[in-house]
Swiss-Prot record:
InterPro entries (UniProt xref): Tim10-like, Tim10-like_dom_sf
A cellular component term, taken from the record's GO annotations: mitochondrial inner membrane
GO term, biological process aspect, one: protein transport
Location relative to the cell: Mitochondrion inner membrane
Species, as recorded: Brugia malayi (Filarial nematode worm)
Record has Zinc as a keyword: yes
Protein's UniProt name: Mitochondrial import inner membrane translocase subunit Tim13
Length: 98
């Protein structure tokens, strides 16, 4: 979907095409959100753990980075699971309504 659709074009889509388009947009938004979260966490961990410039990481810096990223990934996995559960509940609720 490289081209941008105008409102009139969107109105002409079938309900199935609209669902497909919305699903694709949601998927792209989720990917972008995940990328931004990973970038943010990486920057935070680097800022927290790397205290002085050098040609190599010290053992303390490596451990700090590992722990920081582990905590981030654990938190991210929990948040993602909760979001997936919520989306599934909303889909199930919408399905029951139709």
């Amino acid at each position: 979907m490289e081209q941008i659709l105008d409102v009139e074009s969107l109105k002409k889509l079938t309900p199935e095409q609209q669902k497909t388009l919305i699903s694709g947009v949601k998927q792209q938004a989720a990917i972008l959100t995940a990328q931004n979260m990973i970038t943010d966490x990486s920057e935070r961990c680097l800022t927290k753990c790397i205290t002085x410039p050098g040609s190599a990481l010290s053992x303390t810096e490596r451990q700090c980075l590992q722990r920081c990223m582990d905590r981030f990934m654990e938190t991210y996995x929990l948040a993602s699971q909760x979001l997936q559960n919520r989306v599934x509940e909303e889909i199930a609720a919408x399905t029951r309504m139709t």
